[in-house]
């Protein structure tokens, strides 16, 4: 089989997408059916036995992992809906609130009523002014997420619960986690841009260069959306490719090819961390790591394999990432570009061969 890793990654993505429309009770039985079909597929598959075994194995494993994610990740969090609690949390991301001195925020809760819990994310429509990376304590009420066009996007971000702020907001310093430090670097870059540019230009520039969308206003978002350019406000593979390419070119001038590859890989990882591992950046980052990693060890990278691996990595860390519209559009567009490129090369090769035959 050609490109087994790519096939496994794309199949895993498709299965997790389809699983979003299945009742949770169906995950276990369906997983058992597909895993039980592995041996018959190997015995009766004939020339396609490898494909059949891979399909059954990946499908069964994907459904098992989806069942585990629902049982141990999603259900316990959603069970808190309707309860009030004193929480300790760190702000992950913010956007301007509807009222003065408030923000809409996604927070990471690590303590409930004074007891440490497995961290989980909650979305607040209104929270007192806070910055990403800052910790706070407050009394809140948990609630179920509203069923709307943003529901699957919240699931893809690991948010399964909404929160309503009640009272007692008290800042608790800054988080020392890696993601929080990356957020502070983002904030520093945004502050530097704010000193040079006025709003709304500073917010748009920060979103396009550092992935910091905190300064984006609804008017700017609506304007870009109306022009069909909302994707420009998101850090994408273009930015990552430019950073990695510039680092590689700068170090390569010293005559150290392997050192240049290693530096480009490090810069790609650092940029992925800075932008919060968004789907488009992870997809491009995986491709860049395979490209420079292959060059580092004198191996040739493959675009489809890197794309399939990126899909697998994104959905392994959160199976609900498969329902993210931006992820699906990003992968679909990349697959389309790869297919058109391959067809164009095949057409050029055929035209060149016909030209040589005609010349004879």
Question: What would you call each of these model-derived segments?
Answer:
Residues 9-13, 24, 277-360:
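Internal transmembrane alpha-helical bundles of multi-pass membrane proteins
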Residues 114-130:
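Beta-strand/loop nucleic-acid-binding surfaces
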Residues 87-90, 132-149:
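Flexible glycine-rich surface loops and low-complexity tracts that mediate binding to linear polymers
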Residues 9-17, 33-39, 242-248, 264-272, ...:
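Hydrophobic, membrane-inserted alpha-helices
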Residues 161-287, 292-293:
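Aromatic-rich juxtamembrane segments at the membrane interface
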Residues 1-78:
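N-terminal leader/targeting segments
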Residues 82-99:
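Structural detector for short beta-strands of small beta-barrel domains
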Residues 1-4, 43-51, 252-259, 295-305:
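Membrane-helix interface "capping/anchor" motifs
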């Amino acid at each position: 089989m050609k490109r087994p890793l790519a096939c496994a990654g794309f199949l895993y993505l498709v299965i997790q997408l389809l699983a979003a429309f299945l009742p949770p009770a169906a995950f276990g039985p369906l997983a058992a059916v597909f895993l039980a079909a592995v041996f018959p597929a190997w015995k009766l598959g004939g020339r396609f036995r490898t494909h059949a075994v891979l399909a059954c194995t990946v499908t069964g494993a994907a459904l098992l992992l989806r069942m585990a994610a629902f049982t141990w990740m999603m259900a316990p969090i959603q069970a808190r809906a309707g309860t009030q609690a004193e929480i300790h949390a760190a702000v992950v991301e913010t956007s301007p609130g509807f009222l003065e001195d408030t923000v809409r925020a996604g927070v990471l809760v690590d303590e409930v009523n004074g007891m440490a819990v497995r961290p989980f994310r909650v979305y607040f429509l209104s929270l007192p002014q806070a910055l990403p990376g800052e910790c706070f304590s407050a009394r809140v009420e948990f609630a179920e997420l509203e069923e709307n066009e943003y529901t699957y996007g919240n699931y893809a971000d690991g948010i399964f619960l909404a929160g309503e702020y009640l009272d007692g907001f008290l800042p608790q310093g800054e988080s020392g986690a890696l993601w929080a430090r990356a957020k502070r670097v983002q904030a520093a870059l945004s502050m530097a841009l704010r000193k040079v540019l006025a709003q709304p230009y500073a917010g748009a520039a920060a979103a396009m260069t550092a992935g910091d969308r905190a300064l984006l206003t609804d008017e700017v978002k609506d304007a870009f959306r109306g022009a069909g350019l909302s994707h420009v406000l998101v850090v994408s593979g273009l930015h990552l490719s430019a950073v990695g390419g510039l680092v590689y070119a700068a170090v390569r001038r010293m005559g150290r090819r392997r050192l240049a590859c290693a530096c480009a890989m490090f810069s790609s990882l650092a940029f992925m961390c800075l932008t919060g591992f968004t789907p488009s950046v992870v997809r491009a980052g995986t491709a860049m790591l395979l490209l420079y990693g292959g060059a580092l060890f004198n191996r040739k990278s493959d675009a489809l394999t890197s794309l399939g691996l990126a899909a697998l990595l994104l959905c392994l860390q959160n199976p609900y990432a498969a329902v993210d519209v931006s992820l699906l559009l990003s992968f679909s567009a990349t697959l389309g570009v790869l297919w058109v490129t391959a067809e164009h090369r095949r057409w050029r090769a055929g035209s060149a061969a016909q030209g040589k035959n005609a010349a004879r």
